[in-house]
Design a protein with these regions (language model features):
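Carrier-protein-dependent adenylate-forming modules in NRPS/ANL systems
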Residues: 1-169
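Conserved N-terminal segment of class I S-adenosyl-L-methionine
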Residues: 175-177
Length: 178
């Protein structure tokens, strides 16, 4: 395996109608997760970017997970932004990260629009028609050392520091548990 999406899709083939993720308000099947993620990935293709950071500013819920996978389907990497962290900390992360876009939902619209000029709303992304041909083209260009996500810590100096994690890093870690 060279891409974390292969794990998701393999699980979806085996357990299409089984619940993959739950939170206190929703549950999502593997099939729905793949479908929603591909819609997001298709919409993000308009950015014409690869291996670039895209921030995801949403509550910790099943929808945010499809945001992460959707970014990956687009050939880019995601950065989780906690909606409850202070705005100045988010701004410092954005100064370092320079994300090309921000995914959020309407619940966080005001904050999102104050942070970035290119904002995608989850609710709108769910109306996107999946372009499987374009997603396949992007996938064929991906390699295992491509970034999957960036994680920011507080940093000892008070300036957030980021670490980028590749598909290979996560695949190796997951394989270790088999």
């Amino acid at each position: 395996m060279k891409n974390i999406l292969e794990y998701l899709e393999k699980s979806a083939q085996q357990y299409f109608t089984k619940v993959a993720f739950t939170d206190e308000n929703h549950e999502m099947t593997y099939g729905s997760c793949v479908e929603c993620s591909k819609k997001i990935g298709t919409a993000l293709l308009e950015l014409k970017a690869k291996r670039k950071p895209i921030a995801v500013l949403m509550d910790k819920n099943v929808e945010s997970l499809t945001g992460f996978f959707g970014v990956v389907y687009s050939g880019n990497f995601y950065v989780v932004i906690d909606c409850y962290m202070p705005k100045d900390r988010i701004e410092k992360i954005f100064e370092t990260l320079k994300p090309i876009a921000l995914i959020t939902d309407y619940a966080h619209q005001e904050l999102a629009l104050s942070l970035h000029h290119k904002v995608y709303f989850y609710e709108d992304l769910m109306t996107t028609k999946i372009n499987q041909v374009a997603l396949d083209q992007i996938r064929n260009q991906m390699i295992d050392t491509d970034p999957l996500y960036a994680l920011f810590t507080s940093g000892s100096t008070g300036v957030p520091k980021g670490a980028v994690v590749s598909h290979r890093n996560v695949i190796n870690y997951a394989s270790w548990y088999k």
